[in-house]
A protein has these predicted regions:
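Non-catalytic, conserved peripheral segments adjacent to functional cores
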Residues: 1-89
Length: 92
């Protein structure tokens, strides 16, 4: 069993509609906060999506990943997670 297969099994991950795999580990009773594990494998992409709440990303393992952020659907910035001790990102 590969590390990826092990993580998918142990964390009970399922395919995410925007790409990759995920499992929810917490959701508060008011649906204001949720925590998920999210994993992209090599050559997988996460599709652009609009946020309705702040999103906090944590990087645990693997190759660095570039996160693209656009507040106006025209210009964007990018942040590389997992590089130069950059292991979390808050997107508002």
């Amino acid at each position: 069993m590969t590390v990826i297969q092990h993580l998918i099994k142990e964390l009970k991950m399922i395919a995410h509609p925007e790409g990759g795999h995920f499992s929810e580990s917490f959701r508060d009773e008011n649906n204001n906060v949720s925590l998920i594990y999210y994993m992209l494998q090599k050559d997988e992409r996460s599709h652009w999506h609009r946020l309705t709440k702040n999103e906090i990303l944590h990087f645990y393992k693997g190759d660095p990943i570039t996160i693209y952020i656009s507040k106006d659907d025209v210009d964007f910035t990018s942040v590389i997670l997992g590089e130069n001790n950059n292991f979390h990102l808050v997107v508002e």
